[in-house]
Amino acid sequence: LPISVFKVIRESWRGGQKTTTRTDYIKRVIGLPNDTIQMKEGRLYINGVKVARRPDGNFTPSARDGITYRQFIETLPNGVEHKILELGDNQRFDNTPIFKVPPNHYFMMGDNRDNSNDSRADVSFVPAENLVGRADIMFLSIDWRSEDWTDFDADIRWDRMLSAIGP
């Protein structure tokens, strides 16, 4: 399943005026129409089957906040492998109800599992008409959590520039 770009459109009323906002997200397609998705103790289940994963060391971002993520390689039911990051197995979205993906909708998740605003949160299911495209190349990568955010050049992650996204 590809990493996809999709839009979330929100409408609200302020001062008698209707306001519409659009936010683009880039997340991995995890659930297709009619699939069931659940997280149990930090593990992903698709249609009741635990998705395989194996340890792949640790990852420490360049920011000096001292956080180290556990890194895993996850294998989706179609055989596609990708890396995921986790802080632990009892974080905010590590134990969810079963999500049943409605017809013509998709369930999206970020690869940084414990720090992702995705279908487990307020993004919810993504209607097919909100899919914008597939993400294939990392154009620009910035460490926004760097302590010295005023030094823009130092925050660019040059090793990720123009690299392929996927699978």
Where are these regions (language model features)?
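Soluble "head" domains of membrane/secretory-pathway proteins
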Residues: 2-167
